[in-house]
């Protein structure tokens, strides 16, 4: 994926809560080995290689300086160190490891700075929180862990995660979301959303755009979607409330139910629904095999279920 301003690469090893709780193993016998409180001016970009550190960036359009607060705890003093350097308007932060062997450690870095900021973040484990950020393009590549986004504005918001949780709210931009195993919650998005998942749970609400979603195993819940696109659930249920049908609405399920409570006028659409084993319903019309309704519309809502039900009602 092409990245212009903001890139997040997170190769995480384990899932923790969204608070600061990242450990390389257990948190016994830890002592404070490093504390940082530094201020930097005229910073336009940052590169962070955080290792196991938890990372927070808090943007603010009313400030021009970057403040870095960091702490590092370990049961082996000298094993880890947070290094930082400013050069030509770029702030580099890196968690350094010395020698071999293992040890228990945890740490965090908390950054405040301008809302307009170029960021490049890498992390092996830990949690990432980004608040109040403006950019042309936002990308997050994750292995395993959690990410929380609030008030992010970008032409493209691209999130990929192998396993873990995504919580994103108050966003502007078209979002591409892909997660292998875990949960994703997106709310208050102005833009289109394309979401793909292998297993887990999707919850989307207040999306002012078109939503396409595909989930192999799990449940999808959607509320107040401006336009429904392609909804596919291989094994699980999809429940949609107070949302609008679109000119390209397609429903697919191998095993499970698709239930849609729509605010669209059903007479504005044709319907072509089929099921091998289950029931079909559009408004007051029902069928157990196939259900076709021709309202003379240029738009047709199509749906196929192998084993399960499709229900579309106002």
What is the predicted function of each stretch?
Residues 2-12, 19-77, 98-112, 283-298:
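Short acidic/polar N-terminal linker immediately downstream of export determinants
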Residues 33-41, 81-160, 165-174, 183-192, ...:
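Right-handed parallel beta-helix
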Residues 46-48, 121, 140, 231:
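Active-site alpha-helical segments that house and flank conserved acidic catalytic motifs
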Residues 50-52, 72-74, 99, 125, ...:
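Beta-strand elements of well-folded, non-transmembrane domains
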Residues 53, 145, 260-262:
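Extended lipid/amphipathic-ligand handling interfaces
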Residues 58, 130-131, 263:
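Surface-exposed, acidic/Ser/Thr-rich flexible loop segments
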Residues 61, 166-171, 175, 184-314:
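Short, surface-exposed interaction patches in beta-rich subdomains
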Residues 180:
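Phosphate/pyrophosphate-binding betaalpha-module
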